[in-house]
Design a protein with these regions (language model features):
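A short, basic-hydrophobic beta/loop patch
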Residues: 1-40, 88
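Amphipathic alpha-helical extensions and coiled-coil-like segments
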Residues: 35-38, 42-143
């Protein structure tokens, strides 16, 4: 409405839909997820809420959000990171791809160890992925 008033419009054309309370809540959640300023962890949490609260499967959520099912699966995987890991990732402005690279590691301790190196050395995504792969390779050699 504010934009219409700023443009000097006296009336705003619109379409009114009569929808259920459940569908209204789903639409509101979908709109929030699609906002540009939502962090990738917030987006993942909202998708998880959409799926669990409304009894959806990933394909349903993907359809509602206009995303591929694989994108939804990747977003949900981010929630495997601990709150401490998420805080470091967000606090040091690391990307979703940094976070996904860390998910290849088996334990929180390993992820924190690598995460500290990423932060200390200001590694980009490519170098982070290489560090993770090298760590996994060295671990296999030791076993």
């Amino acid at each position: 409405m504010r934009a219409a008033k700023m443009c000097g419009l006296q009336a705003v054309p619109c379409i009114v839909h009569d929808i259920s309370e459940r569908n209204s809540a789903v639409l509101a959640l979908v709109e929030n997820i699609q906002r540009q300023d939502l962090s990738f962890f917030d987006e993942a949490a909202a998708i998880e809420k959409l799926i669990s609260y409304y009894g959806m499967i990933q394909e349903d959520a993907a359809s509602k959000l206009g995303k591929a099912q694989s994108t939804i699966a990747n977003k949900l995987r981010l929630l495997r990171l601990t709150p401490e890991e998420r805080e470091l990732i967000v606090g040091f402005n690391l990307t979703e791809r940094h976070a996904r690279a860390l998910l290849k590691l088996g334990s929180c301790e390993e992820r924190i160890n690598i995460l500290e190196k990423v932060i200390k050395n200001k590694l980009n995504v490519e170098r982070t992925e290489k560090l993770v792969e090298d760590y996994i390779g060295q671990k296999k050699v030791r076993q």
